[in-house]
């Protein structure tokens, strides 16, 4: 007897190295309407995405709770202590790295309900500038694709 054909899959065929990354990000806003601002950080010059803007956050350490990871990333990238709000969603993307490897990233996105401390830029890290950006200007910046999705699909208005 011939075994049944495998079911169709949305996963691309394996042709090279495959990597997976789990990361956590926060949408931190101040004000409302035309006075609303969102906190963004800019990718540092040593990164391949230098100059692009992203939400504060980043990769989780092995075994790290996403809420703890988000608090850590905000301290590192902005100097702020945060109160993590509700989960807004999980974004998934797959793209090919310059070396040909396929990278699948799961991005856990939370609302940030509050913050304290003084905003500062990260030194010698993955970002070089942390800024409050008016919402109406944020979409005109060179944003990482997931940031555009997070700001337009996940945040409530």
What are these regions (language model features)?
Residues 81-90:
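A short coil-to-beta-strand element that immediately follows conserved catalytic motifs
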Residues 36-76:
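Conserved Nudix-box catalytic region and its N-terminal flanking loop in Nudix hydrolases
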